[in-house]
Amino acid sequence: MSQGQGGITLDDLIAQADYLKRYIDSLQRTQLELLESINSIDSAKQAIETIKSGNKEMLVFIDRKGYLLAKVGGIIGDKVTVHLGLSYYAEVDLDSAIKILDKRKDEISKAAQNLNNELQKAASTYNQIVDILNQIQQAAARRQQGE
């Protein structure tokens, strides 16, 4: 079909499928980052609960991937420093820290849900385009066999 008849070209479909594939990959990477943030918040809350229980020693990860642990002793359990966002941190009591972390987790969870909805829409559109491209390919193969 030509553009003048209100249709789209095969090249347009292929370009759209390629764009959607890259977009889906980007959304999936962002989704993974959000899930990692939620897991980090859960770990932080668990550490606060350990401090609140009066435990004076704790094993902490030195790196992000958990290749190295260190035993930290002499923990004084009345205040912690919490990341508020951007480059801002605050020293707060343990209960306030948990409230801040819960609020941040809720925000990230909502963002993850919105992103998941967008990911589903993009994947659905991508699958529809791939189905159309497969139908075009099958029709072309049948035409070649008929020649």
From Swiss-Prot:
Compartment(s) where it occurs, according to its Swiss-Prot or TrEMBL record: Cytoplasm
Principal location: cytoplasm
CDD domains xref list: Prefoldin_alpha (cd00584)
GO BP terms, alphabetized: protein folding
GO-annotated molecular function: unfolded protein binding
GO CC list: cytoplasm; prefoldin complex
InterPro entries (UniProt xref): PFD_alpha_archaea (IPR011599), Prefoldin (IPR009053), Prefoldin_subunit_alpha (IPR004127)
Superkingdom, natural source: Archaea
Xref: Pfam families: Prefoldin (PF02996)
Keywords associated with the record: Chaperone, Cytoplasm
UniProt key word Cytoplasm: yes
Assembly information from the UniProt record: Heterohexamer of two alpha and four beta subunits.
Sequence similarity: Belongs to the prefoldin alpha subunit family.
Entry function: Molecular chaperone capable of stabilizing a range of proteins. Seems to fulfill an ATP-independent, HSP70-like function in archaeal de novo protein folding.
Protein name in the entry: Prefoldin subunit alpha
